[in-house]
UniProtKB/Swiss-Prot annotation:
NCBIfam families: leuS_arch (TIGR00395), PRK12300.1 (NF008957). One of its GO terms (molecular function) is ATP binding. The keyword ATP-binding applies. Its EC number is 6.1.1.4. It catalyses: tRNA(Leu) + L-leucine + ATP = L-leucyl-tRNA(Leu) + AMP + diphosphate. ATP binds at K634. GO terms for biological process: leucyl-tRNA aminoacylation. This is Leucine--tRNA ligase. It comes from Methanococcoides burtonii (strain DSM 6242 / NBRC 107633 / OCM 468 / ACE-M).
Length: 962
């Protein structure tokens, strides 16, 4: 081994050896297979530190399973379809300043190179090379023979086959449907196309048509039932409004809306024609007619109304909406004569229409008073609004003044009333985003009711039933996300599956459309298996539907597939055999942002196309990664590219840092201070290993083990057990805690106690435990301890728990010694005393019996202080200690129930003569404390000048220092 740790030299050395030995190129054989995939990255930028989390978790699992004896396939491809790469090419062509800055400063692309990346093809070529280089540089154990990009002609043949199959099953339908739409690109947009508002959903509002002078004043609401309680409408006098002619389903009307609403209405399935601009002030102070009950309500000025929300005109229900009440209250003392309003607004009659047990007549007023809300700008107004809406929705019923709807639950009324309003011609559905959405081209998006659009029929109940069954039978990690997956299936509606612009595959049954970028990314895991054979010389025109039918579905005979494709039957049979061996996917590991889209579609398409035995077996989810507290963005920054992370810190250091930062759904934050700590840990690991190897410590004879050696072997089994259990449930942070941090603490204690005979054996186990996490350094140490040629640690056996090496007596002894030494050190630190003598008092017999009995009861699951005390007090010897017994028993119960699982497991069979154990290690205490040490049992304390023996506790001797 080199004298000093040099990450670059070590990592390049082992990456070259892995590549030369083809160790990660998986072929079907007679071993149990493990097929793991992660979402292929989208190539509109370099991979960044955020990718390290999902990708490294996947690699850890792949390496672990490989060392466990599984035949592991871990492939990778590249996602490039859709509009983002086309948009990026246009921005580069136009020398967009922000884009040029982000891609030179954050992505590290030289200016001249970037200027040359002015077509989608050049962008794909550049980033695919960079992405593979970065993944190789961090040590991912990927089978690169299977790589592809989603614009490869061969892959397009596969996607055409998939979509023809879905079309034949009536799972792709044509119709009108609201979609997220970019007016500039004239295309639907998906999550990959969006600059801001990726989480936005399309919400269906009810548009209520108030009437005035032959015109319609429409108001959009999520709570149509509150139309019964409208006292006024809100209009912003500073907004631009327009009069438009709206034709819908043969009905022609004149509407007045904000100019922003007019722009949105153009994209609905209505015919919209501009008539004239309208002065907003002319709309204030008029009386409009409530279409549901013909009540006359006044329009009032409100600066809070935004033109982009709904129609730009808002109905006001102050009895049930805190903001409406506050806004109205703010107008009570204002002079509104400029709008022709002279009446006292205090005279407006509030209308109560919902009965809810937590409130009286006017919930909004009560909530405002309850929270002490001062005005509309008070943050507590939002809190008051949420509590009113939540209680009314979950427990409210409509009152008698709502007519035939009286007694209906608020939670059930929306669809019923909206349908009735539409039938009466006084309402319509209006689609709006839950938050603003901006396309990557910079254009604000709209909800477009697209006619003649192709949709995946995700609302199909029979299709959903299959997905529910798949979710029920697969592993979801962490388990509590199973409910979220089911909920997402519940809510999923039909989704546009085609677009007119971008990169991608033409819809095979309608070549005017391109398949959108999430639709072509659902069953590509099966293509990895075929891709290896395609790379060996199969031509694009040979990828006929019959080939996929035979290989993936067994729908077509081998003879027909061979005849139609022109591929040798033996090759087809090999592809088919490989598919049967590798499929289904054993684990799909992904970030949590993909749950509502990619992962959901992954399940839908698998259950639609494949037989049940080919459905995915498990999904594991992890959280996000931020950079110094800020969200990373490839297109906006900030950004730490994966290549920069490796160059600056090293592959193993980067891997160790990101894996130790957070567990499963927790979000991680990449901090420079944190990765410097990881660097020190790796260097410490290297130096420790180098010292052990260089020391020439002989192999220990297991027949001559000392107590501390037995303890080391016992603790090692616990670390092995905990690491394996954590990796089996994809808790990589917990696994690393055990495999490195806790085990290193054990080793240091072992050395402190004079142990060294087992250091070589421990090192052998330790580097194998660590190999999935930090593979390069572990290969280097593995070689240094005598493994040469192709004897790689990547293929070594992963350590397994050996119960025969567990020694509870040794663990009790070290628990006692370690705890006692720590307590003495703490007393010295607090008192600042330099002791000449330390006296230790071990627990009296009655306390020891109480402790053992409590442990036994806890082990059986029936530890109860009352029962414990009653049982103890049957013993005359116990009764002789009087009130001390109940008091001590209560403390013991409290301590045991607070123990973590590992400590309780260690103590559950507790049996130790503490005095003998301490006496056997008397010299150790003398050396550590630098003074004389005496040991007594509290039952027979010959010297106890300050009555300290009474504080003795099992495994916690009482201490007196002189």
């Amino acid at each position: 081994m080199q004298q000093d740790y040099n990450s670059s030299n070590i990592e390049q050395k082992w990456q070259q050896k892995w590549n030369e030995s083809k160790v990660f190129e998986a072929e079907a054989d007679d071993r149990d297979k493990y097929f793991i995939t992660i979402p292929y990255p989208y190539l509109n930028g370099n991979l960044h530190a955020g990718h390290t989390r999902t990708f490294t978790i996947g690699d850890v699992v792949a390496r672990y399973k490989r060392m466990m004896g599984n035949n592991v396939l871990y492939p990778m491809g590249f996602h490039v379809t859709g509009t983002p790469i086309v948009g990026l090419a246009e921005l580069i062509q136009n020398r967009d300043p922000e884009t040029m800055k982000v891609y030179t400063e954050f992505h590290g692309i030289p200016v001249e190179t970037l200027k040359g990346m002015d077509t989608p093809e050049k962008i794909v070529d550049y980033f695919s090379v960079e992405a593979e280089r970065s993944m190789r540089s961090i040590g991912y154990s990927i089978d690169w023979r299977r790589k592809f990009t989603t614009t490869d002609p061969n892959y397009k043949k596969f996607i055409e086959w998939q979509f023809n199959l879905l079309y034949e099953k009536d799972l792709i339908v044509k119709g009108s449907h609201p979609v997220k739409w970019c007016p500039n690109d004239d295309n639907p947009v998906e999550d990959h196309d969006i600059l801001h508002g990726e989480e936005a959903t399309i919400i269906d509002y009810t548009l209520v048509k108030f009437k005035y002078d032959g015109m319609i004043i429409p108001c959009a609401t999520l709570r149509p039932e509150t139309v019964f309680g409208v006292t006024n409408l809100w209009i912003n006098p500073d907004l631009e409004h327009v009069k438009i002619k709206v034709t819908f389903e043969g009905r022609e009307e004149v509407w007045v809306v904000s100019k922003e609403a007019y722009r949105k209405l153009i994209f609905t399935d209505r015919e919209v024609e501009f008539i004239e601009d309208v002065d907003a002030s002319s709309l204030i102070g008029i009386k409009v007619t409530n279409p549901l009950n013909d009540a006359q309500v006044i329009t009032l000025p409100a600066s809070f109304v935004k033109g982009e929300n709904g129609s730009g005109i808002v109905m006001s229900v102050p009895s049930h909406a805190p903001y409406d009440y506050l806004a109205l209250r703010d107008l009570y003392d204002k002079d509104l004569r400029e709008y022709g309003i002279t009446e006292d607004l205090r005279e407006l009659k509030f209308i109560s229409l919902i009965k809810v047990k937590e409130f009286g007549e006017f919930p909004a007023i009560e909530a405002v008073e309850q929270f002490g809300v001062k005005d509309q700008d008070d943050p507590k107004a939002e809190e008051a609004t949420k509590i009113v809406y939540r209680r009314e929705f979950h427990g409210g019923v409509l009152k008698e003044n709502t007519g035939k709807y009286s007694g209906m639950a608020v939670s059930k009324i929306k669809d019923v009333l909206t349908r009735d309003l539409i039938e009466m011609g006084i309402g319509e559905v209006f689609y709006e985003f839950s938050e603003p959405v901006v396309c990557r081209c910079g254009t604000p998006c709209v909800v477009n009711m697209v006619k003649g659009q192709w949709f995946l029929n995700y609302s199909n109940p029979e299709w959903k039933d299959k997905v529910y069954r798949c979710i029920e039978n697969m592993d979801i990690i962490p388990e509590d996300l199973r409910v979220e997956f089911n909920n997402k299936v519940d809510w999923l509606k039909d989704k546009a599956c085609a677009r007119k612009k971008g990169l991608g595959t033409l819809l095979p049954f309608d070549n005017q459309w391109l398949i959108e970028s999430l639709g072509d990314s659902t069953i590509y895991m099966s293509y990895y298996i075929i891709a290896k054979f395609i790379a060996m010389g199969i031509e694009t025109e040979q990828l006929v539907p019959e080939l996929f039918d035979h290989v993936l579905l067994k729908k077509c005979s081998l003879e027909t597939a061979a005849e139609r494709s022109g591929i040798d039957a033996n090759i087809i049979e090999q592809i088919s055999s490989d598919f049967e061996y590798w499929y289904p996917v054993d684990l799909r590991s992904s970030g949590k942002d993909l749950i509502p889209n990619h992962l959901l579609f992954f399940l839908f398409h698998h259950v639609a196309i494949f037989d049940e035995d080919k459905w995915p077996r498990a999904i594991a989810i992890n959280g996000f990664v931020s950079l110094e507290g800020k969200k990373m963005s490839k297109s906006k920054g900030p950004l730490l590219t994966l290549n920069d992370a490796i160059t600056n810190y090293g592959a193993d250091i980067s891997r160790m840092y990101i894996l130790s930062s957070a567990e499963q759904m927790q979000d991680a934050d990449w901090k420079n201070s944190g990765i410097e700590t990881a660097r020190k840990q790796i260097e410490r690991f290297y130096n420790f290993s180098k010292d052990i190897i260089g020391s020439g410590i002989p192999t220990c004879n297991v027949e001559n083990l000392k107590g501390i050696d037995k303890w080391m072997l016992s603790r090692l089994q616990q670390r092995i057990l905990e690491t394996n259990e954590a990796l089996d449930t994809i808790r990589t942070r917990n696994a690393l805690q055990n495999a490195y941090f806790l085990l290193f603490n054990d080793i240091r204690w072992y050395q402190k106690r004079g142990g060294n005979a087992l250091l070589c054996e421990v090192l052998d186990v330790w580097i194998r435990l660590m190999a999935p996490f930090t593979p390069h350094i572990c290969e280097e140490i593995w070689e240094a301890i005598g493994h040469t040629d192709n004897d790689l640690i990547s293929l070594a056996d992963y350590p397994q728990y050996d119960e025969s090496l567990v020694d509870t007596q040794a663990e009790f002894t070290e628990e006692l010694i370690g705890g006692t030494l720590s307590d003495v050190d703490e007393i010295i630190r607090v008192t600042k005393l330099t002791p000449k003598k330390a006296i230790l008092y071990t627990s009296p017999e009655w306390k020891m019996e109480t402790f053992k009995k409590a442990l036994s009861m806890q082990k059986e699951g029936n530890l109860n202080p009352g029962i414990l005390i009653k049982d103890l007090m049957r013993d005359p010897e116990m009764r002789s200690h009087g009130k001390e017994v109940p008091k001590f028993a209560q403390k013991v119960v409290s301590d045991i129930t607070a123990m973590n699982e590992e400590k309780f497991d260690t103590l559950s069979n507790f049996d130790l003569d503490e005095k003998i154990a301490l006496e056997e290690n008397l010299e150790f205490f003398k050396n550590e404390l630098g003074c004389s040490v005496e040991i007594y049992s509290a039952d027979n304390a010959e010297y106890d000048p300050e009555n300290k023996a009474r504080f003795a506790y099992p495994l916690r001797p009482a201490i007196y220092l002189e």
